[in-house]
């Protein structure tokens, strides 16, 4: 491959997970003419995760959508399922293996974008000026395979994060042979279960997330909101208990684990001087989860990452510097902060809060809120669905005082009690239908 004058590459991408691969693939697919090197410490990719998002049919990742649902369900433990549906939008599921393969195929077809696996990146610092490189331009990255120089660096590496809450989950895609009791969670046939079996205690919210993939297979996750990250083994125990309660106990002859996934997502990320962050170096942009890709109140990030990768690649193709994720609009940021502070202040009421929004907010309004498209009327509907006083008390910003680092607190997981059966799945009465101009 040709070498960019004065640098090893125009752009070096640190970390080739979802965000790093998305940007590299966009640049490989386009015709920017930039020399790009993406490095990652992993030596290969596995089917270790999946991503979901709401969308219509008109997006360029449609070929790798493995499954979609036109209805999705919320349910408080023991209560009826509340089914949501929005015309023209589906809840779409992308397997990690398919996304990795798609991105790598685009990269491998390019003669100017290169993926280097098994390479650990270290310090990032500014380059000294030279005859061909003016002062203030250029970055050098120390890696396990030697130094790399570039005009710009996009750093997507994961790092320790301070946040108000952590969304800890453990999931298994299982072949259950048709034994999974979705009715116990109020999930109707053909629907996904986003937050079902919701229950809360003094430590926070727990719920079961179920994506039926066929008549005999499903992804089942146990999720816990916690002030600190939880031990993977303890969250996994909650997942196993949920599977057993739903009629698909691991180890049973009719149940086979196809793959597993787990993670910890920061909710209400708070910048901290002690955070493991890239120093402020000209030409360096932080992106991915560490750069604010995840929505504070939900943890959703895949669609936001794809939008950022597209915008960043377009800027680079025009000869402009890369960009990070756009800052959250003031109102959205404050609503998410107030909501998360309320979850911290009254963890035992969190299931009630989510159930109230599912019952009291029209599906199209709630969906726009979750996908960063909320209108003022949507925000007012969200506010009206929740109890006033607990949220008014959270108007003062306490996020920094509440933020916890990602140091583990192993004492916060509680055993998952048996799932109580729900009444027959039903579509609960919703607010008056929105007019066409409200939904458009």
Region locations from a protein language model:
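Beta1/beta-strand and adjacent pyrophosphate-binding region of the FAD-binding site
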Residues: 2-19
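N-terminal FAD cofactor-binding segment of flavoenzymes
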Residues: 22, 26-79
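Redox-cofactor binding/interface segments in oxidoreductases and associated redox assembly factors
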Residues: 14, 155-156, 286-288
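Flavin-binding catalytic cores
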Residues: 228-261, 285, 306-329
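Conserved N-terminal/central alpha/beta ligand/cofactor-binding core
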Residues: 56, 62-108
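Conserved mid-domain beta->alpha element of the FAD-binding
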Residues: 270-343
């Amino acid at each position: 491959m040709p070498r960019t004058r004065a640098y090893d590459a125009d752009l070096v991408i640190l970390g080739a997970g979802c965000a790093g691969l998305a940007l590299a693939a966009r640049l490989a697919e386009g015709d920017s003419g930039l020399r790009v090197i993406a490095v990652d410490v992993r030596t290969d990719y596995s089917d270790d995760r999946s991503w979901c998002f709401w969308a219509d049919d008109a997006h360029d990742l449609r070929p790798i959508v493995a499954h979609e649902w036109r209805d999705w369900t919320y349910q408080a433990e023991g209560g009826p399922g509340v089914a949501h549906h929005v015309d023209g939008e589906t809840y779409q599921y992308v397997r990690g293996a398919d996304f990795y393969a798609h991105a790598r195929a685009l990269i491998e077809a390019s003669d100017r974008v290169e993926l280097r696996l098994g390479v650990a990146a270290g310090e990032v610092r500014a380059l000294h000026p030279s005859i061909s490189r003016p002062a203030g331009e250029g970055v050098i990255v120390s890696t396990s395979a030697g130094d790399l120089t570039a005009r710009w660096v996009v750093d997507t590496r994961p790092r320790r994060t301070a946040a108000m809450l952590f969304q800890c989950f453990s999931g298994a895609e299982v072949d259950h042979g048709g034994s999974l009791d979705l009715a116990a969670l109020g999930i109707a046939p053909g629907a996904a279960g986003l937050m079902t079996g919701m229950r809360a205690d003094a430590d926070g919210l727990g719920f079961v997330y179920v994506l039926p993939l066929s008549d005999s297979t499903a992804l089942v996750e146990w999720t816990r909101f916690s002030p600190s990250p939880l031990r993977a083994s303890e969250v996994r125990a909650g997942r196993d208990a949920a599977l057993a309660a739903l009629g698909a106990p691991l180890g049973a002859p009719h149940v086979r684990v196809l793959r597993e996934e787990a993670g910890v997502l920061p909710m209400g990320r708070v910048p901290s001087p002690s955070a493991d962050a890239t120093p402020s170096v000209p030409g360096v942009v932080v992106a991915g989860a560490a750069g604010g890709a995840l929505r504070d109140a939900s943890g959703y990030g895949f669609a936001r990452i794809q939008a950022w990768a597209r915008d960043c690649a377009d800027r680079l193709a025009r000869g402009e510097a890369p960009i990070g994720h756009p800052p959250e609009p003031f109102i959205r940021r404050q609503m998410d902060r107030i909501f998360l502070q309320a979850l911290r202040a009254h963890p035992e009421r969190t299931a009630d809060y989510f159930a109230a929004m599912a019952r009291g907010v029209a599906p199209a309004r709630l969906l726009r809120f979750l996908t960063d498209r909320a209108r003022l009327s949507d925000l007012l509907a969200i506010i009206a669905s929740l109890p006033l006083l607990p949220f008014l008390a959270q108007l003062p910003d306490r996020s920094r005082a509440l933020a916890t680092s990602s140091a583990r607190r192993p004492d916060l997981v509680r055993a998952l009690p048996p799932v109580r059966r729900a009444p027959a799945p039903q579509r609960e009465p919703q607010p008056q239908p929105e007019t066409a101009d409200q939904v458009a």
